[in-house]
């Protein structure tokens, strides 16, 4: 079994390419995962699709075959040629795939180092795949340790001491190009985490914030939580020509702001499109200053400089965690564990046989017979247990079983995973 990761991110792919590769809804994601797992060499898969990356993480029996299948599937859907995809993609296998996963979970591979959104996005991607039957034991093991590694990085470094995200960087960019945000009308389109962060940053800067969404009650809920106002989505065509500031981050698969609704204005407009695929599609002009996620690189570079020391320390933690993960995997082999159980049982029988002979309870001439009989008794007793252990070794509950047995036979096994819902993910993201 191998781990494989194929990554398209802000590091190797333009926004245009990432748009074509993106998966914006559950239906499309489920279809992708189903096609991935239909490959003869792929047995589990997770799809991560955000504004800055689209990645396939899978377990497979053959790396070359799985890689070919993934590129063919992505090319057929996106319209991007296989040659271009192969030229852009970062491909990681086995230990490098785990190292990359840990880096992503710890936000070391993010455009904004230390940003807090990627952990939640990764958690959601894993939960969706797991709940729909596209991943199980092998990827759950890796995800469990990825979130455990992210917790170590968060606790041992300062890269997340001042939480940032693409949304907060976008608001910082706005404040750098607009002298004063206070009192200015700002429209936030969408109600996801990025929209919520944007609205809160704008409000804290004194902007007059309105929130709109296709589902009005969701906009009302977010506006109530933030202290913002609500704009009916039906009035979007008017708002784009009235608001000086606009941020959009929806999950729409098509642009929601196009040339047809944009009219000339006598004031400058500052628009931030943080969606992938993009929400705004228009021809330049009309005093509109449009920024997309890839335009925020300068601020991101400053962020990287500020967090450089913490990032170096984090890379060390990730390296050690990768080694520890594979060491842990090696302990999960069921056969050495069964062998050790038998050896401990036979040794206990031998010691006890010698004790009763030494005390004269049994004549010494019967020593061989007693030894053989005790071994036969133990073999009969342990046979059913060892058979059950072998039968569940490939099931999703295997790690719980092996960890518990390791604990009982006095191995150093401090981390006993409770289940494959990956409690580390929930604990880290929800702060429990």
UniProtKB/Swiss-Prot annotation:
NADP(+) binds at residues 190-195. Pathway: Porphyrin-containing compound metabolism; protoporphyrin-IX biosynthesis; 5-aminolevulinate from L-glutamyl-tRNA(Glu): step 1/2. InterPro entries: 4pyrrol_synth_GluRdtase, 4pyrrol_synth_GluRdtase_dimer, 4pyrrol_synth_GluRdtase_N, GluRdtase_CS, GluRdtase_dimer_dom_sf, GluRdtase_N_sf, NAD(P)-bd_dom_sf, Shikm_DH/Glu-tRNA_Rdtase. It comes from the Bacteria. The active site is at residue 51. It holds the Pfam family GlutR_N. One of its GO terms (biological process) is protoporphyrinogen IX biosynthetic process from glutamate. One of its GO terms (molecular function) is NADP binding. Keywords: NADP, Oxidoreductase, Porphyrin biosynthesis. Substrate binds at residues 50-53, 110, 115-117, 121. Coiled coil: none annotated. It catalyses: (S)-4-amino-5-oxopentanoate + tRNA(Glu) + NADP(+) = L-glutamyl-tRNA(Glu) + NADPH + H(+). It is an enzyme of class 1 (oxidoreductase). Its EC number is 1.2.1.70. The record marks 100 as: Important for activity. PANTHER family: GLUTAMYL-TRNA REDUCTASE. During catalysis, the active site Cys acts as a nucleophile attacking the alpha-carbonyl group of tRNA-bound glutamate with the formation of a thioester intermediate between enzyme and glutamate, and the concomitant release of tRNA(Glu). The thioester intermediate is finally reduced by direct hydride transfer from NADPH, to form the product GSA. Homodimer. Possesses an unusual extended V-shaped dimeric structure with each monomer consisting of three distinct domains arranged along a curved 'spinal' alpha-helix. The N-terminal catalytic domain specifically recognizes the glutamate moiety of the substrate. The second domain is the NADPH-binding domain, and the third C-terminal domain is responsible for dimerization. Belongs to the glutamyl-tRNA reductase family. Catalyzes the NADPH-dependent reduction of glutamyl-tRNA(Glu) to glutamate 1-semialdehyde (GSA). This is Glutamyl-tRNA reductase. It comes from Sulfurimonas denitrificans (strain ATCC 33889 / DSM 1251).
